[in-house]
């Protein structure tokens, strides 16, 4: 079955395939959904809060109002777990509000989408925050709500920021600036200047993987099972407690 957005590439597709080709098949070809768990639910709540805040207010005093309005109650195993994560998110938002008082950038858009075409492929991305800095350059920001940073994290190798940089240049004509991953729970920002991104290499990498997405071979990557939200239902899962019966959500 060929999905409707065949020949379209985005970072989520690429990241999913690199994590596990079989997971890509489940999500993007068969249309199965992962569902929410506590960590991902809080991530959705934080992202939505910051989008609503920067779109409608930019007054730090209003951030908690937006958080309470945007907090998502789904994905928690109990009321106690929901409260635990609500309080975690509240602390993240309170700390973010303190930092907001000193921000000097101009927010140009949140969840801002770019689309461009190259060699028969359509590239698409959605940027959490796009802003103009006091020096006139531009700043692309992707929020992460992780509580820790992976030991092998290297911002210079981020395929996500690389595509966002290329998209910012090609779709919007903004050539001066930087792209960043902002770990909001940890108040850490990792950036790469636009000029450090080799556009040709980035597009070549995406198209190389894109060719594989059009194939029929999607082998499982069992070393990823422990981190996969499908691990209890996937027929290839090596998770010891997975369900025997695999079914659609």
Identify the residue ranges that each predicted region occupies.
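RecB-family 4Fe-4S metal-dependent nuclease core
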Residues: 1-249
